[in-house]
UniProtKB/Swiss-Prot annotation:
Gene3D superfamilies linked: 3.40.1370.10
Any Gene Ontology biological process: translation
GO molecular function: rRNA binding; structural constituent of ribosome
Protein name: Large ribosomal subunit protein uL4
Pfam families registered for this protein in UniProt: Ribosomal_L4
Family from the record: Belongs to the universal ribosomal protein uL4 family.
Subunit structure, interactors included: Part of the 50S ribosomal subunit.
A GO-annotated cellular component: ribosome
Protein species of origin: Bifidobacterium longum (strain NCC 2705)
Matching NCBIfam families: rplD_bact (TIGR03953)
Keywords, ordered alphabetically: Ribonucleoprotein, Ribosomal protein, RNA-binding, rRNA-binding
General function of this protein: One of the primary rRNA binding proteins, this protein initially binds near the 5'-end of the 23S rRNA. It is important during the early stages of 50S assembly. It makes multiple contacts with different domains of the 23S rRNA in the assembled 50S subunit and ribosome.
Gene: rplD
Length: 218
């Protein structure tokens, strides 16, 4: 399989070279990506569901205090029969079929998550919206980060991927409204599809490719 060529730029946004990205990670065809949109949707839905707190709660008529006494006798008053002032039709009565605490998380196989990420990255790469940047930042500087990203992303919303050693670069971009910084071991399908551009640092790109392509020890 032929690899995908990604541009590498410097701190001023000038092209300095290219890197070869594995086709399996960045070069899936547009037709194949289109065919797997349901998979991407399922993985993203599961990710968003897992992020839900699920602590919502309402009280049923059995949980609301009071209401243990029948408000008036069954017959002879001319009024509608009532058994409790905490029945749902009463003011301050219990809630019927209201939300209760629950776990929204779904089980998603690792292979499905990995495949969805490949398709999402390939979709961005097919559109020319994946790049590698060498920031060269030695101390936190938002101005320097903007100068490096602007020629590539044109101020569109961008996910920038770092290694945990790229702390100065991470600190430099975290205050940019159109940038979502993320560490390479946290890269996921949702953050890719919600961004118009995906930018890797050189170290993050190498770490990502190595983690996805090198065989794991038994």
């Amino acid at each position: 399989m032929a690899n995908v060529t990604l541009n590498v730029t410097d701190a001023k946004g000038q092209a300095t070279g290219t890197v070869e990205a594995p086709e399996a990670l960045f070069g899936v065809s547009a037709e194949d990506v289109q065919a797997h949109i349901p998979l991407i949707h399922q993985v993203v839905t599961a990710q968003l569901a897992a992020a839900r707190q699920g602590t919502h709660a309402t009280k049923t008529r059995g949980m609301v205090s009071g209401g243990g006494k029948k408000p008036w006798k069954q017959k002879g008053t001319g009024r509608a029969r009532q058994g409790s002032i905490r029945a749902p039709q009463w003011y301050h009565g219990g809630t019927v079929f209201g939300p209760q605490p629950r776990d929204y998380s779904q089980r998603t196989p690792k292979k499905m998550k990995a495949a969805a990420l490949r398709y999402a990255l390939s979709d961005r790469a097919n559109a020319g919206r994946v790049a590698v940047v060498e920031f060269g930042i030695t101390e936190p500087s938002t101005k320097a980060a903007v100068a490096a990203l602007a020629p590539i992303t044109a101020d569109k919303f961008t996910t920038v991927v770092f290694t945990r050693d790229n702390i100065n670069e991470w600190l430099s971009v975290r205050n940019i409204p159109t940038v979502h910084p993320i560490f390479v071991d946290q890269l996921n399908t949702y953050d890719v599809i919600t961004s118009q551009y995906v930018v890797f640092t050189k170290e993050a790109f190498e770490a990502f490719v190595a983690a996805k392509t090198e065989p794991k020890e038994a």
